[in-house]
Amino acid sequence: MTLRESTPPADLTTVLHAACAQTGLDPAGARLIHHYANAVFLLPKEDAVARITSARHADTARTGLAVTRWLTDVVGYPATGPLPDLDPIDVHDATVTFWTYYAQHGRPRPDSTYLGAVVRQLHDLPHPPVELSRWRPLHSLHAAVADPAQSRALSDQERSWLLTRIEQVQDDLADLDYPLGWGPIHADAWAGNLLWDDTAPAPRVVLGDWDSVCWGPREVDLIPSWHAAVRYGKGPQWARAFADSYGYDLAAWRGFDTLFAMRDLVQIAGPLRQAPYNQTFDRSLKQRIAGVQADDRNPWVEF
């Protein structure tokens, strides 16, 4: 797993060491390798990673852990695997889970063809023996934007406009008929959540980051690849390769534009959290809001 590295805040290090003390894992040499919605630490002594989630999202962390245990241990689905026999640890207003570390050895990241295959496989599975929440599109984003403490990077005008737009897209989503039906969905199925797994008898690609797993319309897991083709400059061939691998052309469905608008809004959530502390994220937030307001199909520049 090769992700953005940074210097961890002192409170995250405290949480990590407290959780490791409860599990008997060795945090020596721990390194923060990702800090976005969650903080992810590499534990080199254990060949594992620790994911630190805010306590307010403890239920989703527990659900993701239970689902991936079923996927990996029972049905043999290619998901990132949690460390065996370790329950989530609640400590210092956070929840910590522990996972297998997948070293990427400088390989190219798996592309949309791999993603289409693993999403198709997921959508063909039965309901897991885990209670899944029902998909609530843009619910957490609406709450964050409505809370001045969480959205202080926004002007009052931006906040008001975004709340109206979120509610409009939510209404549009509720009016759609979903031809692929409802079932267990990943709900953030983009290629950045794919990793090479060399722990299996033969190298394979696994799907990670199961914090958003829920019961919802399967089309939700398809839109990220079309969105990446446009907003992140992957190009039409990226979406076509996904469609060929999955076996369905989402762009031919009448609800495509509504789902694209939803994904645009979803992508505001990440920089919204980080913008008050980081100018790069603030520029990214402003760019994305401008694109949503223009309702255009222009690529977003990575700052």
Where are these regions (language model features)?
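All-alpha amphipathic helical-bundle segments outside canonical DNA-binding/catalytic cores
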Residues: 251-259
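Active-site acidic catalytic loop and adjacent metal/ATP-binding pocket
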Residues: 33-45, 49-50, 82, 170-222
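A cross-family kinase active-site recognition segment
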Residues: 106-160, 180-182
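ATP/Mg2+ or Mg2+-diphosphate-binding catalytic cores
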Residues: 3-4, 148-154, 237, 269-303
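A conserved alpha-helical element in kinase catalytic cores
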Residues: 9, 13, 51-93, 103-124
